[in-house]
Amino acid sequence: MSPSTATFIPTRNPAPALPVVEQSRESRAATFMIAAALLDYPGQEWDDILTEVASTLAQLPAEAAAEFSQFLDWAGERSRREVEEAYVETFDQKRRCCLELTYYATGDTRQRGIALTIVRDLYAAVGWQLDNDQLPDYLPNILELAARTEGEEHELVESMLASHREGIEILHAALLSLSSPWAHVVAALRMALPEVCLLY
């Protein structure tokens, strides 16, 4: 599989350089869980999620906490319906903001089926069963898996994240180009991700 086959729309705004942020395993897991919750569709438990996230920020490095705080400020000033509308407009109506990671590596090609099989094999390897209707490469699902696994299983998930780091960078750049509040969430996530390691 090659990134050259992807059909995403490039952006003109490159992502800023990552700050050097030292994080413990616990703070990285917290970052993954927070990002998973905030990048998922804002359902009925949204207000409770925002409250829980706010109470967790003290566990994170200041740089990551600051990014999440900016998103919380934005979301706190809006009703859940307004956040839902913004979410749909951002992630469901703009292909360049796709939350399905294999899309960035393969586009809508036959190769994507192979890529999705690799992700499904990862879930099977760590004994994890999805409890929603999303595809297995849905970023919030993978982030939750990264937060909840340990040892060799966690290393497998981190390798998967690293292999899709380029797609996450493209997503972040696209969100920045739209001045999307979710750019802050992905910015915080980037600080906790493993180094780039392309498999395709």
Where are the model-predicted features located?
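Short amphipathic alpha-helical segments and their helix-coil junctions
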Residues: 8-20, 114-128, 167-173
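Eukaryote-biased recognition of C-terminal alpha-helical segments
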Residues: 185-196
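Short secondary-structure subsegments characteristic of cysteine-rich extracellular domains
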Residues: 152-175
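Contiguous, well-ordered alpha-helical segments that form the cores/surfaces of helical PPI scaffolds
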Residues: 33-37, 103, 137-147
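Short, extreme N-terminal leader segments that mark the start of a protein/domain
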Residues: 1-55
